[in-house]
Amino acid sequence: AKELAYDVVTGQTDKLTAALAKTSGKDIVQFAKAVGVSHPNIDKKVCNGKHKHRTEDGSPTDFEAVPKTNKTAQCSGLNAEDTSKLFSKFVETVELHDKNWPTGKTYQTSTAKDGIPNGNAKAVAKDLIDLNSDEKTIVAGLLAKTIEGGEVVEIRAVSSTSVMVNACYDLL
């Protein structure tokens, strides 16, 4: 959980993707629910985009656990961005607790197929990294609190002034 929080705050998409891919779908669901309950403005910024949409996936406008025509289980795999789609609803709709994590399914030529390997983890990571600084701090805290085995940690910034004050104090 510390690794996830650190990767969000520092904007390390690849490391965040790898860490998210190792996290259980159940834990991601708990995180998404916490986001939805406490920060609805962030809830509508994750998994509702089109950056993971591929031409062969058709024109999905909504999510479904086992995709059919115009449906997908790929985070940010919509044909067009839709801010009415919420992260907290995405995880429920695609049944992330026991399927579609870290790889989602897409609908191609009359059947649901596995999407991009670790595609859902990659999309969630990108969407989290794209948040503003304050939102990333909030997300880091929620990740630390909701991911199994997580513990709350405080990451402080150290300024040169405090280092100088401490150094001078130590000399006295």
Which residues fall in each region the model found?
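Long non-transmembrane domains of secretory-pathway and surface proteins
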Residues: A1-L172
